[in-house]
A protein has these predicted regions:
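Histidine-centered catalytic micro-motifs
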Residues: 18-28, 75-82, 146-154, 388-391
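Hydrophobic "anchor" residues on beta-strands that sit immediately upstream
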Residues: 16, 97, 241, 345
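Metallo-beta-lactamase
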Residues: 79-197
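Active-site metal-binding loops of divalent metal-dependent hydrolases
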Residues: 1, 23, 47, 79, ...
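Core dinuclear metal-dependent hydrolase active-site scaffold
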Residues: 62-92, 96-97, 221, 225, ...
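Short, well-ordered beta-to-alpha junction loops that form the rim of enzyme active sites
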Residues: 147-152, 158-159, 204-206, 245-248, ...
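Rhodanese-like catalytic fold shared by cysteine-dependent sulfurtransferases
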Residues: 110-112, 123, 170-207, 211, ...
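Active-site HxH/HxHxD metal-binding segment of metal-dependent hydrolases
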Residues: 1-74, 93-95, 279
Length: 426
């Protein structure tokens, strides 16, 4: 919430409302903390049932903020309470719409997130979403700007654009949900076929956003706990505790604490913590570079992981200097892989099925990282692992190492660099 508070201070402005588009599944939104610090009212659309004080607005209810207004437009489908907010300027002209997870750029919000906890089928929700987009958003002026809740990389959609704002006019041309290229039945099929597996922490985050969550100041005070080597080792022996190494992947592979999980701060950190660690109540011990302790705890808390026991004081260096056991991951350049690709080697591709449709290595095994099922793998075999750029493959290597796989090679640079050396790609 710091960005909002800084802007408010900069412009000497009062935060009057906190407009929520829905109960978010992929992060803890910070609405209660912001409300407590500013006195602002939290606003949801119809069907929302928060367990704290909030305004449950009606469809088309108007909120005045100075000389502008925001109109709540109920646009269910992603979830049943999903709403968008249409902003009108000082002249009363439609200016932009904040669509949350209803409409993305080039895509729409997938419906399966909601049906996991609302008891409604994904097909029903997809049909409701079709009606919301065509009856509520499509009739609006093409001149308005569309500000979605996510860009590319979010698990709340299938194939979003990387841009963060566009005109509705352009989206009516290129977005399949708006350009008339699909009937309602075809839209439902397109949206519900091959849905990505949502991270297991999503329902927990929905619950936190709906019921309430721990105050971050308290979480930070408890978690910012420097641990001696002996205390760190003692705590790490508990079965319900994981060691999370958040350093750069190229540093991690050269040496790390055996059994630790790599999820680097420089990548899609929070969503992958949720996908890999899964249970938000898991006790976490952190290994990080100096001065990154607060950032690590903050970003963990944003997805509901508030149970950090502390961090290794002086980082991995103190482990290394104490002559403790160290593990590592071997790497191989795509150019060197080219020399052995035709021999009998086992390749694991941890990218999504959608990514593989754009190109894949022949005979590679697909085990997407967001559903990392290793039951078919043999611990004594050698595996060569890649993703798109190297971040996810290193996460996969750390997970396999933790399970007892010893002969692993991370393919440096991932599929992006594989393409550069003219390997045979299907």
């Amino acid at each position: 919430i710091s960005s909002y508070l800084k802007l408010s201070k900069k412009y000497n402005a009062k935060i009057k409302y906190i407009f929520e588009t829905h109960f978010h599944a992929d992060f803890v939104s910070g609405h209660l903390t912001l409300a407590n610090k500013t006195g602002a009212s939290i606003v949801y659309g119809p069907n929302a049932d928060p367990e704290f004080k909030a305004i449950i607005a009606k469809d088309n209810e108007v909120f005045e903020i100075g000389n502008i207004t925001l109109t709540l437009i109920h646009t269910p489908g992603h979830t049943l309470e999903s709403s968008s907010y249409l902003l009108k300027d000082e002249q009363g002209k439609d200016n932009c719409i904040f669509t949350g997870d209803t409409l993305f750029l080039g895509d729409v919000g997938i419906p399966d997130v909601a049906q996991r906890y609302m008891g409604v089928s994904k097909e029903e929700l997809a049909g409701i979403l079709y009606d919301s987009i065509n009856n509520k958003i499509k009739p609006l002026s093409g001149d308005i700007l569309v500000y979605p809740g996510h860009g590319a990389g979010s698990a709340c959609g299938k194939n979003m654009m990387k841009e963060t704002v566009d005109t509705l006019k352009n989206q009516k041309k290129i977005n399949y949900s708006l350009n008339g290229s699909f009937s309602k039945d075809d839209f439902i099929k397109e949206l519900t076929d091959d849905l990505p597996v949502p991270p297991t922490y999503f329902p927990s985050n929905v619950k936190l956003n709906q019921e309430g969550y721990k105050d971050f100041d308290i979480v930070l005070k408890k978690s910012l706990n420097p641990l001696s080597l002996n205390d760190f080792k003692s705590l790490s022996k508990n079965d319900d505790t994981v060691i999370l190494d958040v350093r750069d992947q190229d540093v991690f592979k050269q040496g790390f604490i055996p059994g630790s999980i790599f999820i680097g701060l420089k990548g899609g950190f929070a969503p992958w913590v949720g996908s890999v660690v899964k249970d938000i109540n898991t006790k976490i011990l952190v290994v990080c570079e100096k001065d990154f302790e607060v950032e690590t705890i903050t970003r963990l808390s944003r997805v509901g992981f508030d149970n950090v026991l502390g961090y290794l004081k002086d980082g991995f260096d103190v482990w290394k200097k104490s002559n403790e056991k160290i593990d590592s991951v071997k790497s191989i350049l795509p150019l060197n892989l080219k020399e052995i690709i035709d021999s009998d080697i086992s390749l694991i591709d941890v990218r999504s099925k959608l990514e593989r449709e754009k190109g894949l290595l022949k005979n590679s095994i697909n085990i997407p990282l967001n559903d990392f099922d290793t039951n078919t793998l043999i611990k004594s075999d050698t595996y060569y692992i890649h993703c798109a750029g190297g971040y996810r493959s290193m996460i996969a290597c750390s997970l396999l190492k933790r399970l007892g796989f010893s002969s692993l090679f991370d393919i440096s640079g991932g599929f992006a660099d594989i393409r550069k050396v003219n390997l045979k790609i299907n």
